Amino acid sequence: MASNNLNVLNALDTAHTQWYHVTAVVIAGMGFFTDAYDLFCISTISKLLGRLYYYDPHTHAPGKLPHTVNNWVTGVALVGTLTGQLVFGWLGDKLGRKKVYGLTLILMVICALSSGLSFGYSRKVVIGTLCFFRFWLGFGIGGDYPLSATIMSEYANKRTRGAFIAAVFAMQGVGIIFAGLVLMTVSKVFLMRYAGKAFSTDEVFSTEPEADYVWRIVLMLGALPALLTYYWRMKMPETGRYTAIIEGNAKQAAIDMGKVLEIEIQAEGEKLAKFKSANDYSLLSNEFFQRHGLHLIGTMSTWFLLDIAFYSQNLTQKDIFPTMGLVSDAKSISALREMFETSRAMFVIALLGTFPGYWFTVFFIEKIGRFKIQLMGFFMMSIFMAIIGVRYDYLKTKDHKWTFAALYGLTFFFANSGPNSTTFVLPAELFPTRVRSTCHALSAASGKAGAMVSAFGVQQYTQDGEVHKIKKAMLFLAFTNMVGFCCTFLVTETKGRSLEEISGEDENQNETKMKGRPVSGGHQDDGWD
């Protein structure tokens, strides 16, 4: 059937992959680079902060952040991210994607630098100031989620759209690798010059005074990538879909996208008026609920469930690694040595499990499809977490630490090659232009709500490192993944279709309309029957 789409939208959908697609991935991905860098670093830094600021000589044990303080240090950025997602997602639909896009990077740069400058006359002031700036860092990072996903989906062609959106998200993998290298390099440099004694030998000076500079340098370096891409982000034009469909300026959309694609595009004023009038419904309307209600429930629920498991893995790595035997006992090493060993273990797990998973999705999402990849990821994560939970006593012994590490790494691989990527991609494709950024924001905010369950619930539960608690936590995470597997059936496959065809905006077949067919069967659309 012939498409009712505008010329400018058809040109975007059928364009060959060009250099601007690659530059858009890098420019849009810097927020996720910073997000992953911060998440990776803070888990390790929180242990160092405990040794620096919370040493109690009466306990004869290395300093450790109190549960509540640790939860806020690691979790406050998640609260900021959730808030930023909702605010900037809504602004992206109301004011335009580009108008608020630069502000997110400015927030990231300022707050990353300020986090490293969290000085004070007491530990309460230092931690309080750090949490304040980490909230606003998260606020900026959160704004990048809906804006970057929406911009990339509206720029890309329909044949490779999923791969490019996934590539934006895969910049998290690059951020993780960079964070690991920075942590290891900075801590090693200070170790070479200021190495302290083991805690068992000297309780006070096993925590090197110079270590107070280490965590500050690491946090401040997170501002560098965002700063380097600010100029190029400001040079990007507004997306053709927003300019044409929302602003109603077909001529400007044709000019902007013509420059990007290096072709001439004819504007269609009369056709645009009909196009706009057929799709003028709001997020809270019955029309939206009939077309996309279950899809929104599906994207929100799967992201929520995924992030409970995913952030629990990331935030509790520092506690699980000693049990796995990948990090020395805290009493046998100095503070900087502990930081180096923890970051090294996290780096190896990320390099072998997390990083390949992101790029597996980039290369195979257009071949396998979003729906199948998400189902596979949830299912395999559940299996491996259940094995760890059931056999934890066996796996935690020294003789089986590498089996433990392999199983733990595989959960990261299938998270990133599955739902961690697809839950980001699908909300950028399923919903109409008028509410695309807002719907992605709602889905992403649900994910961060799950991450907060992890930070303030699962992490606190396992912080003591007690075996029976870690076993129960892993089995709980296995269960949440199976629920995510079931909720995946609420979304539909989007592979190979234009955004307007998926959302029904071009009025061809209104394929996502749900009257008389509650689930627009991802399994049916994807040929599973």
From Swiss-Prot:
Q: State the reactions this protein catalyses.
A: phosphate(in) + H(+)(in) = phosphate(out) + H(+)(out)
**Entry-linked InterPro entries:** MFS_dom, MFS_sugar_transport-like, MFS_trans_sf
Q: Which SUPFAM superfamilies match?
A: MFS general substrate transporter (SSF103473)
Give residue ranges on the Cytoplasmic side.
Answer: 1-21, 93-99, 146-163, 233-291, 366-374, 427-472
Q: Which GO terms describe its biological process?
A: phosphate ion transport; response to symbiotic fungus
Mapped to this chain, the residue ranges on the Extracellular side of the membrane are: 43-71, 121-124, 185-211, 313-344, 396-405, 494-529
Q: Which residues cross the membrane?
A: 22-42, 72-92, 100-120, 125-145, 164-184, 212-232, 292-312, 345-365, 375-395, 406-426, 473-493
Instruction: Name the organs or tissues of expression.
Output: Expressed at low levels in non-mycorrhized roots.
Any one Gene Ontology molecular-function term assigned to this protein's record: symporter activity
Where can this protein be found? Cell membrane
**Induction, as annotated:** Regulated positively by RAM1 during arbuscular mycorrhiza (AM) formation after inoculation with AM fungi (e.g. Rhizophagus irregularis and Glomus intraradices).
Recorded GO CC terms? plasma membrane
Which UniProt keywords are present, listed alphabetically? Cell membrane, Glycoprotein, Membrane, Phosphate transport, Symport, Transmembrane, Transmembrane helix, Transport
Q: How does it sit in the membrane?
A: Multi-pass membrane protein
Cite the residue spans of the region called Disordered.
500-529
Q: Where is carbohydrate linked to this protein?
A: N314, N510
**CDD domains from the entry?**
MFS_PhT
Function, as annotated, reads: Low-affinity transporter for external inorganic phosphate (Pi) probably involved in the acquisition of phosphate released by arbuscular mycorrhizal (AM) fungi during AM symbiosis.
Query: What remark does the entry add?
Result: Although related to the sugar transporter family, it does not transport sugars.
Q: Which family does it belong to?
A: Belongs to the major facilitator superfamily. Phosphate:H(+) symporter (TC 2.A.1.9) family.
What name does this protein carry? Low affinity inorganic phosphate transporter 5
Native source organism of the sequence: Petunia hybrida (Petunia)
